Amino acid sequence: MADDGDMFLNFEIGDAPIKQTVKYTGGRWRDRVKAQKGEKGGQDQSKQASTARRDTGADYYTNRAAKRQRTEDGDSGRFSKTPRTGNAAERGPPPPPTHAMKTGLVSSRLFTSNPVPVTDFEELPQAEEAEPAQPSNAPLSAEAENFLSLGLSRRVSQHLATKLEMKAPTAIQKNTIPQLVKEDSDAFLQAETGSGKTLAYLLPIVHRILALSHNEDGTPKTTKVHRNSGLFAIILAPTRELCKQIAVVLEKVLRCAPWLVCTTVIGGESKKSEKARIRKGVNILIATPGRLTDHLDNTKVLDVGTVRWLVLDEGDRMMEMGFEDDIKTIVGKIRAGTLQKKNAEGVVLDGVLPSRRVTVLCSATMKMNVQKLGEISLEDAVHITASKSDMEKDAETGAVETAFSAPAQLKQAAIVTPAKLRLVTLIALLKSTFARKGSVMKAIIFISCADSVDYHFELLKSTTPRAEPEPKPEGEAPTKPNIHIESTVAPATYITSPANPTVMLHKLHGSLAQPVRSATLKAFSECKDPAVLITTDISSRGLDVPAVELVIEYDPAFAVPDHVHRIGRTARAGRAGKAVLFLLPGSEEGYISILPKSTPIAPQLYDSILQKGFATNINVPGTESGVLETDRQSWASRAEALQLHFEQRLLAPLPGATPVFESKSEKFAASKQGKKGKKDAKKDENKTPDNPLLVSARQAFRSHIRAYATHVREERVYFDITALHLGHMAKAFGLREAPGGIGGGVSRRTHRPVQPGDKTNKTSKSVGDGTARRPKKDDDDERDFGAADEDAGRRMKEKMKMMMGNMASEFNLG
């Protein structure tokens, strides 16, 4: 102690630094760097927090970035490009973070990080109201042409005019009917979709068969023709639906001659029933190539000796589907037999029917593969098109391949929308389509794969139970519900409106059973309410459904000819129609340039569709109010709220199930407690089952990505799988992250073939010669695959336990 009263203290602090530092050793260098950064970040955050508490409020907010001013209406407008319509004052910046974002809840952001379209929509010419185009596939004037002048009998012509209300033929019918009525040469029939190709070849066949028993004026002859008189014509079609439709059209025509019989033989039906119908007798047979080949090999009562016509409808499609060998077999068996001049009853066929077998090949698109089909089936064929000028030109140049465009009265549009906005844009388009009563009665949505069709059907259908039908008055038998359409037809939700409170939803694809497919297509055709059909390319060929006014290509076709057939489901027989194509920003926008177009395809951005579709409230299932609740009444807010609703609906646990784990740590902790190898995992009853809709969404996503990679080689420059953002595309299926296993497919185990001397006893004991037994080919359960899996799982579990339970042992914290 000093004299002046002051006190001096000496502290010994040692040689260690004042600030304690932590050094990480061991493990990978990436993990050490991450741990050091995390330690440093934690210290910096604590320092900043303490500094912020000491500072005044004014000083604290001085360093913050300036916030953008919120507009009064809260409308976000378009964020990548400003819309062409509307005043500039109505265009606002992106919406500010909602309260859900501030409180830590999940919010689905759709209008951020989207790719910029290549097309400059600002420089596109303003669309002008053009005069309605003259229909290119409409019937001709009744004063100029009629069926009687084309060479058809009076009986057939009167039946078409009075019963079927067909006063005049179309252009392709005008050029085809006289050729097939008077000549016996093969025909190469080509015309655009919806132009009446089916009747163009059916009417001459019916006319000439009818001439066996009736004169031109309709008076009967002495000879009689009935179902046992012989098989005169075979019509091949690629799909069962097209066969059914051809049969429906032919049955309407044959009402003028009820003694003539037609039938179908298609896959999915009972072969026993088909053989019974053939045994009773049939004059015109409509078949798919595979089933007809089966009957030619196994059905002895099927006699093709009297066959005079072989029609190949949609010949290019049959070649694409791999029916080349079947067609060769069919043509070979028909030509191998001797052409009978008289039938079994002694009726002379020559002079009335063709003296040779006539082959007719027809389609809307004739590609190069049809040349090969023509070499198989045609001999000196006449090329018939809708206009005489085309016929003369093809006769001079010998051209075979012609690119046919869509009907002239068809309006086409292409919507450029980012992957994240595809689903909500589709809902907005359908909602605006059915906003007015009577505006559109039926719409078809084409999707690339069956799994995606199933998912979108389950997503859009109403979850409320159907109302019981009203009881019938006394004396009337109650109508029985069709069990075949219970899973394929349902009322829709999200897309209804006060004007159309009921919109029926249908689904159709090739994986459904044939009775279900037929019943669904019939229900869609006969539906009196507004209806939507979600389908694959199975419905793109030849189907003629009345009142289809809108076709949506949600997934672009795999080839341009398929696109032509898709949009040909509308604007048929001179009626108006509209086709909409969904494209992603970027390389897909160039796809428009290679599409055949009789009318210009107008590209447009998604914002106009969202503004129109989400201008009013959206009806959603499972809520008390029945409508989608949003903080702000704008189309952008409704779009994001609808996307969030879809994601929450997929993640919702099943009734009575345990809550779904949200974080990865919770999932890992649950896996540690509940999974003890493969056998224990199978027996774990506490595992939460996934929502079936979530499982369907994941499978639909995987199938969609696989289908995206199957475009034809010439078009892959526009559909580049490597440029596809999987995370954004997952949003289009209501998923928050892209599921894995896209390229895995079905896992299969291969085994070495069992040698003749091997023993296949089910015991694992050695046989007498000392060799161990080898299991049977399908004996997967007896193979010892589980030992290696359990050992690997045990080692991985121990390593993960060491990492998660004791971090010091991994990094050797000092």
From Swiss-Prot:
Bias-annotated ranges (Basic and acidic residues): 28-42, 69-78, 467-477
CDD domains in UniProt: DEADc_DDX31, SF2_C_DEAD
InterPro entries on file: DEAD/DEAH_box_helicase_dom, Helicase_ATP-bd, Helicase_C-like, P-loop_NTPase, SPB4-like_CTE
SUPFAM superfamilies: P-loop containing nucleoside triphosphate hydrolases
Kinase found in the keyword field: no
EC identifiers of the protein: 3.6.4.13
Coiled coil: none
Positions of ATP binding: A191, E192, T193, G194, S195, G196, K197, T198
Residues covered by the Helicase ATP-binding domain: 178-384
UniProt catalytic activity: ATP + H2O = ADP + phosphate + H(+)
Protein's name according to its UniProt entry: ATP-dependent RNA helicase dbp-7
Organism per entry: Neurospora crassa (strain ATCC 24698 / 74-OR23-1A / CBS 708.71 / DSM 1257 / FGSC 987)
Gene: dbp-7
